[in-house]
């Protein structure tokens, strides 16, 4: 299941803002870039609710897997975790999150991937 529209990041200005103004958290399998939300950037995308809600994007390089099926499977796993855990915990946090997966073969190890993802969420203080 994909992220709801009000939780998605989109547009090159948004990603440029995150790359310039983010705090980076590194793990073995992925890196997090967390930045304070800036709703003015989203106004150019005609968002009716350009609020300070938590938003996220997951970027998976072809270096992780050449097959789009595997990359989409990983993306769906992480998005499902976000959908089930973030609204319950704190959807009011005004942060934007960009998740970049590092090079490696971990398509078959869902538990290791989710454990690393959850550890970085705690480390970045997006969840408590």
Curated annotation (Swiss-Prot):
Pfam families for the chain: Ribonuclease_P (PF00825)
Keyword check for Nuclease: yes
EC number per UniProt: 3.1.26.5
Catalytic reaction annotation: Endonucleolytic cleavage of RNA, removing 5'-extranucleotides from tRNA precursor
A cellular component term, taken from the record's GO annotations: ribonuclease P complex
Matches recorded under InterPro entries: Ribosomal_Su5_D2-typ_SF (IPR020568), Ribsml_uS5_D2-typ_fold_subgr (IPR014721), RNase_P (IPR000100)
Keywords, comma-separated and alphabetical: Endonuclease, Hydrolase, Nuclease, RNA-binding, tRNA processing
Gene Ontology BP annotations: tRNA 5'-leader removal
Top-level class of the enzyme under EC nomenclature: hydrolase
Highest taxon, organism lineage: Bacteria
The keyword Nuclease appears for this protein: yes
UniProt GO MF annotations: 3'-tRNA processing endoribonuclease activity; ribonuclease P activity; tRNA binding
Protein task: RNaseP catalyzes the removal of the 5'-leader sequence from pre-tRNA to produce the mature 5'-terminus. It can also cleave other RNA substrates such as 4.5S RNA. The protein component plays an auxiliary but essential role in vivo by binding to the 5'-leader sequence and broadening the substrate specificity of the ribozyme.
Family from the record: Belongs to the RnpA family.
Subunit structure: Consists of a catalytic RNA component (M1 or rnpB) and a protein subunit.
Protein name: Ribonuclease P protein component
